[in-house]
Amino acid sequence: MKTLYSLRRFYPVETLFNGTLALAGRDQETTGFAWWAGNARLINLSGKLLGAHVAHAGLIVFWAGAMNLFEVAHFVPEKPMYEQGFILLPHLATLGWGVGPGGEVIDTFPYFVSGVLHLISSAVLGFGGIYHALLGPETLEESFPFFGYVWKDRNKMTTILGIHLILLGIGAFLLVFKALSFGGVYDTWAPGGGDVRKITNLTLSPSVLFGYLLKSPFGGEGWIVSVDDLEDIIGGHVWLGSICILGGIWHILTKPFAWARRALVWSGEAYLSYSLGALSVFGFIACCFVWFNNTAYPSEFYGPTGPEASQAQAFTFLVRDQRLGANVGSAQGPTGLGKYLMRSPTGEVIFGGETMRFWDLRAPWLEPLRGPNGLDLSRLKKDIQPWQERRSAEYMTHAPLGSLNSVGGVATEINAVNYVSPRSWLATSHFVLGFFLFVGHLWHAGRARAAAAGFEKGIDRDFEPVLSMTPLN
């Protein structure tokens, strides 16, 4: 068996099937990895690895385009998006495409265009992936040195990191330009129940924006998830885009410092573990963001948050009973606390009953009824608008608590609709994926560190139990 430099620590298992899997430099004999180890076979074949990554991007973009068109084909304008199981159209609507006042969809053509553009892009990526996987050079170092690399080349690795950071920064600025110049984005806080608007007065104050990072993650603080106006969100993207681009330029122009060279493991598997760790953190943050935040993820498209649906129920019954003559300011509930209104731990007037635990909810249909000391009794008696009643009644029956068999809403709510909120799907999927990515991070980090330390030798084949067993054939 040829012993390559990369094979020093591999002791491949011989199986009955090895002879049939000669894949020209991608078989177990020459790489130390069996076919099921996926891209591990391509660790030293930069051209083939490029093909795998481009083809993977093609699959992702194809799914986005096809699913986008599937949702457009199934779209019913009479029902809210969140009642139709959509997970892509809400994102397009949040960007201001195809929607008008109150989040009403007035034109589905932009959604169709988005789907078609993604399908066309996926065809280009798919062709590129197949080309590089089957026809292109196996390694890029000789023919295209700019695109070639050696995993241990620290300077080249930080250059690649820098290019990635610049691309991420450009992505952040695309959102900024959309909000500033290209038609604006959907603002759930626009007066009268939300509308598309251009963001003109960006928040660029570092004390405000970086103050979010210093907040507690609990309760009414809510870390960065507590952001509740688009000026802060778009201004934050200006800062993030700038930091990413400047950091990218920095990493392209500089070499890693001595402390970084010593502290980090410099191998392909180590970079994989770093990436998985970062994606895991993104997944957990996205989970919290989509579950709690109704500014970046407007309730008109994603359905109400859990606290929002609960507060909407309290509001709906306050409106009903007030019309029937109840004195909502003083009525007592079964525990002796206020039935409709009570005071929070810090003295604000809040909704009473079980929803008291969600007293720090902020929602655009409720904020106009607050005064300096919480809910304003005179506004509750005189200023409630029909759109606020309609929206809270809708949200009350669409709590994001559905189970997988589509029994939506609160179990005791007889008016609930059979549906699973996209908020539930997006939060749950990002939590689960974030968890698995974290496990993958630990796994690959452990392997990479062991390999770097020189004790990843595998099982001693001389004493392997299988050698004393009867052959399968």
UniProtKB/Swiss-Prot annotation:
One of its GO terms (cellular component) is chloroplast thylakoid membrane. The modification N-acetylthreonine is found at T15. One of its GO terms (molecular function) is electron transporter, transferring electrons within the cyclic electron transport pathway of photosynthesis activity. Gene3D superfamilies: photosystem ii from thermosynechococcus elongatus. The modification Phosphothreonine is found at T15. The chain crosses the membrane at residues 69-93, 134-155, 178-200, 255-275, 291-312, 447-471. It is a multi-pass membrane protein. One of its GO terms (biological process) is photosynthetic electron transport in photosystem II. Residues 1-14 form a propeptide. [CaMn4O5] cluster binds at E367. Binds multiple chlorophylls and provides some of the ligands for the Ca-4Mn-5O cluster of the oxygen-evolving complex. It may also provide a ligand for a Cl- that is required for oxygen evolution. PSII binds additional chlorophylls, carotenoids and specific lipids. It is found in: Plastid, Chloroplast thylakoid membrane. Keywords: Acetylation, Chlorophyll, Chloroplast, Chromophore, Manganese, Membrane, Metal-binding, Phosphoprotein, Photosynthesis, Photosystem II, Plastid, Thylakoid, Transmembrane, Transmembrane helix. One of the components of the core complex of photosystem II (PSII). It binds chlorophyll and helps catalyze the primary light-induced photochemical processes of PSII. PSII is a light-driven water:plastoquinone oxidoreductase, using light energy to abstract electrons from H(2)O, generating O(2) and a proton gradient subsequently used for ATP formation. PSII is composed of 1 copy each of membrane proteins PsbA, PsbB, PsbC, PsbD, PsbE, PsbF, PsbH, PsbI, PsbJ, PsbK, PsbL, PsbM, PsbT, PsbX, PsbY, PsbZ, Psb30/Ycf12, at least 3 peripheral proteins of the oxygen-evolving complex and a large number of cofactors. It forms dimeric complexes. Belongs to the PsbB/PsbC family. PsbC subfamily. This is Photosystem II CP43 reaction center protein. It comes from Pelargonium hortorum (Common geranium).
